[in-house]
Amino acid sequence: MTTPNDFQTRTDRIEVAEVELRRHIDKVVEGLRAKDLDALKQLYTTDVVSFDVEPPLQHVGIAAKLENWAKVFMLFESVAYEVRDLTFTVGDDVAFGHAFARLSGTLKNGATTGGMWVRVTYGMRKIDDTWLIAHDQVSVPLDIASGKGVVDLEP
């Protein structure tokens, strides 16, 4: 039996996948802004490995990833999150992407924070026809001389 996908070229499939991947990251942004852990849970593999800017060196599994976001949400009354310059390289069932991202908002104590721009890398897997984040890494540049992260750069 022939399906519509049988007639798609590889280029067409990659273009469709890139649209799906961008929508997926848009859902991450929406979930963060809404502080919706249930929505975020649907966007990651159960065995996600996350290298985030705060300790420990890695967060392994969806529970650890969500616990990390829950800690952030406890600090913020309202969350703003933006992604810039998102780029993907797409295969049939694996893709990777990179972008700049910034978390900002109003803290529970009423103070506002402009946040800091970070570099983010996504490792994506297509499982049962759905793209999921299997790995993410968030980082800031390091000033070698001082040994401190540089957090005042902008894209």
Where are these regions (language model features)?
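C-terminal-biased regions
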Residues: 2-10, 16, 75, 98, ...
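Surface-exposed, charged secondary-structure patches
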Residues: 20, 49, 64-109
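Short beta-strand segments enriched in hydrophobic/aromatic residues
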Residues: 44, 101-103, 137-140
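Hydrophobic pocket/interface hotspot
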Residues: 28, 40-41, 48, 61, ...
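Short beta-strand edge/turn micro-motifs at domain boundaries
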Residues: 1-3, 117-148
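Short, low-complexity N-terminal intrinsically disordered segments enriched in polar/charged residues
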Residues: 1-47, 88, 150-155
